């Protein structure tokens, strides 16, 4: 983990006694204050008695401890991956093919949430009446307040609107127990193609996802992948993979990440018409400001020089001030000559 203010780098995938993991670790997620880091790992030496495959762990950087997250409410070990954590580090959502609660009888991977304070594990990928999905659920995300879980699935039994095997985006409210179909248009009609990889604002109001569906917005009539935002309060769905002038992207857009308040969404796009600074089909990082419908190129270097190669894996900080991404570009900073993918951070170009 890199502390950008102190200029220090800390190894996170270690046991409580500081022993380095004996296998691969990845997919980290960090609490708002940086104290807790959850990650998945194939290592068997991070906690005592771990002999299974991939698990989710949590590192407390202040206490210097590492704990296993993928357990049931009786502390019986399971397995899992793809963690997503609440701002305070109390709740950790993860994806698991294990039966960690009695109600999970579908024999398929599902989304779970671990409450580290109460020591309980609950199933999140289920319908409002508690019915588990009838097919595969993909890894999802947890809202910053720990209340909402979003994911995409091919299940047809989570909503009366869903009667096909397309991938659809859902949101589960852990407080009310209700589950809501998200990949719908403003009129409430379900998307006519699959939708993928949602992310959610801290309060659960805004959910961003991408889809090739052509009926989610009147601005979209092609089958290219585009990024949309669902406003659950106003029941609207908005196309955001478009330029500041409202011109829709002419190539694929995907992989959104949303700020805590839902104002900013970053995403990847191969479109060449989203910014006057971009005239090629390389994958670039963009920031869309929902408050004024502006779209700005973010994968730029000194003097706003556009990256000379592909960028990928983008995310935005909770406060919306910093955008991080991976890039093969060698002109984003001085003396980047290794010819490999590197991790970069830039100030949100929309924020002055």
Question: Where are each of the predicted segments found?
Answer:
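Conserved "turn/edge" positions that cap or connect secondary-structure elements
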Residues: 1-352
């Amino acid at each position: 983990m890199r502390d950008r203010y102190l200029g220090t780098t800390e190894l996170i995938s270690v046991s409580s006694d500081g022993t380095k993991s004996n296998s691969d670790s990845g997919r980290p997620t960090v609490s708002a204050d940086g104290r807790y880091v959850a990650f998945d790992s194939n290592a068997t030496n991070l906690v005592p008695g771990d002999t299974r495959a991939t698990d989710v762990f949590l590192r407390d950087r202040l206490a210097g401890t590492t704990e296993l997250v993928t357990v049931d409410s009786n502390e019986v070990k399971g397995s899992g991956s793809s963690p997503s954590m609440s701002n305070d580090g109390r709740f950790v959502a993860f994806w698991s093919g294990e039966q960690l609660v009695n109600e999970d009888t579908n024999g398929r991977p599902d989304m779970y949430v671990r409450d580290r304070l109460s020591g309980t594990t609950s199933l999140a990928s289920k319908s409002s009446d508690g019915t588990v999905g009838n097919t595969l659920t993909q890894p999802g995300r947890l809202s910053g307040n720990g209340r909402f879980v979003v994911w995409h699935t091919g299940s047809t039994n989570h909503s009366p609107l869903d009667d096909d095997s397309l991938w659809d985006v859902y949101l589960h409210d852990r407080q009310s127990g209700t589950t809501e179909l998200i990949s719908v248009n403003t009129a409430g009609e379900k998307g006519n193609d699959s939708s993928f990889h949602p992310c959610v604002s801290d309060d659960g109001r805004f959910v961003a996802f991408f889809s090739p569906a052509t009926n989610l917005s009147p601005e979209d009539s092609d089958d290219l992948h585009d990024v949309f935002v669902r406003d659950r309060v106003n029941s609207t769905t908005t196309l955001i993979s478009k330029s500041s002038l409202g011109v829709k992207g002419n190539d694929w857009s995907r992989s959104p990440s949303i700020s805590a308040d839902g104002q900013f969404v970053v995403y990847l796009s191969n479109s060449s018409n989203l910014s006057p600074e971009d005239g090629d089909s390389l994958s670039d990082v963009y920031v869309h400001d929902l408050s004024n419908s502006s779209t700005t190129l973010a994968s730029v270097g000194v003097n706003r020089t556009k990256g000379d190669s592909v960028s990928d894996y983008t995310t935005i900080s909770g406060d919306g001030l910093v955008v991080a991404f991976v890039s093969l570009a060698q002109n984003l900073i001085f003396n980047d000559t290794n010819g490999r993918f590197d991790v970069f951070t830039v100030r949100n170009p929309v924020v002055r």
